[in-house]
Amino acid sequence: MKAIQLQEFGGAEAFQYVDLEDPTPGDGEVLVEVTRCGVNFADTHSTRNDYLAEQQLPLVPGAEVAGRTPDGRRVAALVGSGGYAEKVVVPESLTIPVPDEVDDDQAAGALDHGLTAMALVKRIAVIVPGESIAIEAAAGGTGTLAVQIAKAAGS
């Protein structure tokens, strides 16, 4: 399979287009043929090894993907790394079904920010329909989605 891989940390100049062996899923895992991979803040920092968790080389970046399983299901998943490849192995329990009305661009691009915004608005904030709320940094990916989720919830 084709993949973007880093042998040394850096920006886009460190990306190498390589051939790798197809990954093999183990028990409780599923192979996902990647159709889209999101690019977010964590991805750009993981390639420089200056984010939360120390990265190991060689590294195939890409934390959020959309794609198809061998049985034809459309899924999205947060994978940590490996999304910049044609195929990635994902724990079955971490796959999210993608409904027909959501395309793969939307599923992969909104996964990390969308789950974060949903958790903030639905689980942490107390939203009372009709009341106003303030969302700091509403111009960013997570903030923009948080505004939309809060509005749909009645704020």
Label every PLM stretch briefly.
Residues M1, R73, G130-S132:
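Nucleotide donor/acceptor-binding cores
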Residues A108-A110, G114-S155:
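Mid-domain Rossmann-like dinucleotide-binding core that forms the NAD(H)/NADP(H) cofactor-binding site
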Residues G10-Y17, D27, F41-D43, A85:
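Short N-terminal binding/cap micro-motifs at the start of the first secondary-structure element
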Residues A3, V34, V88, A117, ...:
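Terminal peptide-recognition signature
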Residues V18, E86-V88, E131:
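Extracytoplasmic/periplasmic beta-strand context in beta-sandwich domains
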Residues V32-R36, L94-I124:
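Extended, non-globular alpha-helical segments
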Residues E21-V39, R48-G82, V89:
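Glycine-rich beta-strand-centered segment in the early N-terminal region that forms part
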